[in-house]
Amino acid sequence: MKTVVLSLGGSILIPELAKNRISAYLPVLKEIAGQHRVFVVVGGGGGARDYIAVARKLGIDEGTSDEIGILVTRLNATLLIAALGDAAYPKVAESHSEAKKFGESKKIVVMGGITPGQTTDAVAAVLAERVQADVFVNVTSVNGIYDKDPKSHPAAQHHATLTPKQLLSIVSQGGLGAGSHNVLDIIAARIVERSSIPLVVLDGTRPKNLSDVLLRGKGEYSVVSSTKKKVLPL
């Protein structure tokens, strides 16, 4: 049994409340949790962006706007926990320490944002360190890491494997797939480098792709690792 930390983008799980993918993700998360310890960090998605946009129009400062966004991530996390039922720990973890403690239950642990100015990708990267994860997975809207935005550059190169240093180089150039806010931010990339925990980046718009990649090694994805040790399937 391995420990897996998932950064599940809000734009993937709940792009819009009426167009959420929660039902489709339930059997996928349960299948993975049947074989491994699973921690999920949920992003804010369209809901968080909408609230933050309104807050800015009202002249609310950035720190408070971030706190509003964090509340939305926790609301999304609460919805996922309720939908998972007995498979999940019944409370949203509000710190890395809480998440680690809740993990002792062997149930799926779900959390949202923690600190203003920090993305849920960064939260997940630190959580991976705290729980000594075997793999950190970023579930996003593209099938891995590219040297340029593949949506605007058809000839962009997909990286099946790369080192943490190569990842940082791409992030610092602003060339991560659909945009660093959708694939990985630079803080999370730095944490990946220091932790030496393998990172997997995959497309989560088709939920079953997550279990296919992690449990069966099927599909297209990117692996960031400081060693040549085989990461997938788990």
UniProtKB/Swiss-Prot annotation:
Keyword set includes Transport: no
Gene: pyrH
Reported function: Catalyzes the reversible phosphorylation of UMP to UDP.
Residues binding ATP: G10, S11, G45, R49, T140, Y146, D149
Primary site of residence: cytoplasm
InterPro entries, per database record: AceGlu_kinase-like_sf, Asp/Glu/Uridylate_kinase, Uridylate_kinase, Uridylate_kinase_arch/spir
Record key words, sorted: ATP-binding, Cytoplasm, Kinase, Nucleotide-binding, Pyrimidine biosynthesis, Transferase
Binding residues annotated for UMP, in chain numbering: G44, D66, I114, T115, P116, G117, Q118, T119, T120
Gene3D superfamilies tied to this protein: Acetylglutamate kinase-like (3.40.1160.10)
Phylogenetic classification of the source organism: Archaea, Methanobacteriati, Methanobacteriota, Stenosarchaea group, Methanomicrobia
NCBIfam families attached to this UniProt entry: pyrH_arch (TIGR02076)
GO-annotated molecular function: ATP binding; UMP kinase activity
Regulation affecting activity: Inhibited by UTP.
Name of this chain's protein: Uridylate kinase
Assembly mode: Homohexamer.
Protein's UniProt keywords contain Cytoplasm: yes
Enzyme class: transferase
Catalytic activity: UMP + ATP = UDP + ADP
Pathway: Pyrimidine metabolism; CTP biosynthesis via de novo pathway; UDP from UMP (UMPK route): step 1/1
Subcellular location: Cytoplasm
One GO CC term, this protein: cytoplasm
